[in-house]
From Swiss-Prot:
Catalysed reactions listed for this entry: Hydrolysis of (1->6)-alpha-D-glucosidic linkages to branches with degrees of polymerization of three or four glucose residues in limit dextrin
Active site: 336, 371
Gene3D superfamilies per record: Glycosidases (3.20.20.80), Golgi alpha-mannosidase II (2.60.40.1180), Immunoglobulins (2.60.40.10)
Protein name as catalogued: Glycogen debranching enzyme
Pathways involved: Glycan degradation; glycogen degradation
Disordered, as annotated region: 459-484
Top-rank lineage group of the source organism: Bacteria
Assigned EC number: 3.2.1.196
Protein family (similarity comment): Belongs to the glycosyl hydrolase 13 family.
Keyword terms: Carbohydrate metabolism, Glycogen metabolism, Glycosidase, Hydrolase
Record lineage: Bacteria, Pseudomonadati, Pseudomonadota, Gammaproteobacteria, Enterobacterales
Pfam families recorded: Alpha-amylase, CBM_48, GlgX_C
UniProt-recorded Gene Ontology molecular function terms: glycogen debranching enzyme activity; hydrolase activity, hydrolyzing O-glycosyl compounds
Uppermost EC category: hydrolase
Length: 658
């Protein structure tokens, strides 16, 4: 290898051209940048990056090839009060690294210093960036581009979804490969979901606190390298990218989209006592929101917050998203704590990152889903994200639980949430699909636990049950825990059926948590982020097959109802919806606000949802005509009902006009 040539300022990261590697690094405040390369024995050689265009440092290393391990040492001021924490003794990861060798361990050498710099070299223990080649044969792969009106999302964890699946080869369980295996593809198709939304797959780290407790970060919301796949779910680290792309290709062939949960709000460097392994040492002042005293704004609850209004960081975020779309063919993103994306530092719909995404021909055409809050002041922004974003709708989640489980909720509030929360999302030209309706998600109780536990049981997390929300809107139906007498178990089953029907037959985009269709329980743990064990892994051998069949039938039914698949707002008299009382008459103003939880929802003038959310059996008079209950509420040969449905307590039934 020779000394570095000046190279080019783009593309960002380490790019192999067949003859050598071009390296670039953004740092607005650095005074000097050293590229450090390592041989197979760990010997280090350093080169100054000779070029600088604007805030991008660059150089070209002739003869370098894929597999080369490298990092950076960045020189600049140590001025903590001004937000500058340069420390060239610390080897740093390339923020654009496509592969990383080594884990982020709880090691004293990885700390850059608090008030004074830590002068101990960390190269022996620091993770290393690795040069890769992105070549891959996509064959005839094409994005499914499922319309929002027909989209049904399935949220899953790469490992937890398949680790215990008995029909998969042992060696691929819990891996990217398993996602595209014919057994899983067939299951997704039988269930009827159209999009697989994966918890974070970008390489992440376990927080030092968890490592000291013998736990790991299971969910993955602690990002370490945003362009690199988490290697633990591949047959070998160097195969992660191809195995993930193989899975995407197989899912696309089956018409299933792949959506990634992505964490663009903070990094695994955490607070000032956390490790310094990348952004803090590269350009702390640019990458993070810094307070006047030099500490971090902690709007994420994770110690730091990425400054996504800084031009260099906006470019970093957009290039990251484009990488996943262009290199891995993913179909969209769910953004964790997405209010951070709009902070300037107050939330703005025209924030720089939103504007950049909207202007990008690649990103503006994929599915974009916001978790529309963070923990900072003004962080709750449900309904306020600009097009083309959809948003998780916590109003729907809470209303569905409060309606069917013993909580106070009016019929009017329930109907509003059933109709895609038009009071929240019908603005800025957005369609009903902007409301991503959910009952449960990775964060919180599973659906089964919603009907079995009144209180969270998070003792296994090591925080004395202090972590996790206390606002669960759950109901154990009379006994805390999974067991109980037959009549109690039947009431729980009825509640689960009613909740699933509400989710899958309401307007908006439904999201189903993987395992809810099995009856999966986390035994009351509503914050299982650190439980990489049987508590979170889906037990396919214990799955409730009847509940899976029920869920699949609901999804098939949904796809038959034009009022749900059309993705247009319901208007008075358009034939999409009529709201009726138990006597098949329009609901009165008093019934909307004060009436019993009894109603009928007529969709597309052909499908009738009869609802009895009271504690008593109640006769419900159906509208004129011949009505037949449809699967999953009856068999195909179910007799016609012409007048009255005897609605059981906490009961729901769907009829089709003859």
């Amino acid at each position: 290898m020779t000394q570095l040539a000046i190279g080019e300022a783009t593309p960002h990261g380490a790019t192999y051209d067949g003859h050598g590697v071009n390296f670039t690094l953004f740092s607005a405040h650095a005074e000097r940048v050293e590229l450090c390369v390592f041989d197979s024995r760990g010997n280090e050689r350093r080169y100054d990056l000779p070029g600088r265009r604007g805030d991008v440092w660059h150089g070209y290393l002739a003869g370098a090839r894929p597999g080369l391990r490298y990092g950076y040492r960045v020189h600049g001021p140590w001025q903590p009060a001004q937000g500058h924490r340069f420390n060239p003794v610390k080897l740093l990861l390339d923020p654009y690294a496509r592969r990383v060798e080594g884990e982020l361990k709880d090691h004293p050498l990885l700390h850059g210093g608090h008030d004074e710099p830590d002068y101990r070299d960390n190269a022996a223990v620091a993770p290393k960036s690795v040069v890769i080649s992105d070549h891959y044969d996509w064959e005839d792969d094409a994005a499914p581009r499922t319309p929002w009106g027909k989209t049904v999302i399935y949220e899953a964890h790469v490992k937890g979804l398949t680790y215990l699946h008995p029909e998969l080869p042992q060696e691929i369980r819990g891996t990217y490969k398993a996602l595209g295996h014919p057994v899983m593809v067939a299951y997704f198709k039988q269930l009827g979901i159209t999009a697989l939304e994966l918890l974070p797959v970008a390489q992440f780290a376990s927080e030092p606190r968890l490592q000291r407790m013998g736990l790991t970060n299971y969910w993955g919301y602690n990002p370490m390298a945003m362009f690199a796949l988490h290697p633990a779910w591949a047959s070998s680290p160097e195969m992660a990218l191809d195995e993930f792309r193989d899975a995407v290709k197989a899912l696309h062939r089956a018409g299933i989209e792949v959506i990634l949960d992505i964490v663009l709000n903070h990094s695994a460097e955490l607070d000032l006592d956390g490790p310094t392994f990348s952004l803090r040492g590269i350009d702390n002042r640019s990458y993070y929101w810094i307070r006047d005293d030099g500490d971090y704004h902690n709007w994420t609850g994770c110690g730091n917050t990425l400054n996504l209004s800084h031009p260099g960081v906006v470019e970093y975020a957009c290039e990251c998203l484009r990488y996943w779309v262009e290199t891995c063919h993913v179909d969209g993103f769910r953004f964790d704590l997405a209010s951070v994306m709009g902070r300037t530092p107050t939330f703005r719909q025209d924030a720089p990152l939103f504007a950049a995404i909207k202007a990008c021909p690649v990103l503006s055409t994929v599915k974009l889903i916001a978790e529309p809050w963070d923990i900072g002041e003004g962080g709750y922004q449900v309904g306020n994200f600009p097009p083309p974003f959809a948003e998780w709708n916590d109003h729907f989640r809470d209303a569905a639980r409060r309606f069917w489980l013993p909580r106070n909720l009016t019929t009017g509030e329930f109907a509003c949430r059933f109709a895609a929360s038009s009071d929240v999302f019908k603005r800025n030209g957005r369609a009903p699909g902007a409301s991503v309706n959910l009952l449960t998600a990775h964060d919180g109780f599973t659906l089964r636990d919603c009907v079995c536990f009144n209180q969270k049981h998070n003792e296994a997390n090591g925080e004395e049950n202090r972590d996790g929300t206390n606002s669960n809107y759950s109901d154990n139906h009379g006994k805390e825990g999974l067991g109980g007498p037959l009549d109690l178990m039947e009431r729980r089953r009825d509640s689960i059926h009613a909740l699933l029907a509400t989710l899958l037959l309401s307007q908006g985009t439904p999201m189903l948590l993987a395992g809810d269709e099995h009856g999966h329980s986390q035994h009351g743990n509503n914050n299982a982020y650190c439980q990489d064990n049987a508590l979170t892994w889906l037990d396919w051998q214990q799955a409730n097959r009847g509940l899976t069949t029920f869920t699949a039938a609901l999804i098939r039914l949904r796809q038959q109802i034009p009022a749900l698949t059309g993705n247009s707002w319901w208007e008075e008299g358009d034939g999409n919806v009529r709201w009726l009382n138990k006597n098949a008459q329009p609901l009165s103003a008093d019934e909307w606000q004060n009436g019993p939880k009894l109603m009928q929802i007529l969709l597309s003038d052909r499908f009738l949802i009869a609802i009895n959310a009271t504690l008593e059996v109640t006769d419900i008079v159906l509208p004129e005509g011949e009505w037949r209950a449809v699967p999953p509420f009856a068999g195909e040969d179910n007799p016609v009902i012409t007048a009255v449905w005897q609605g059981p307590a906490h009961g729901l039934c769907v009829f089709q006009r003859g």
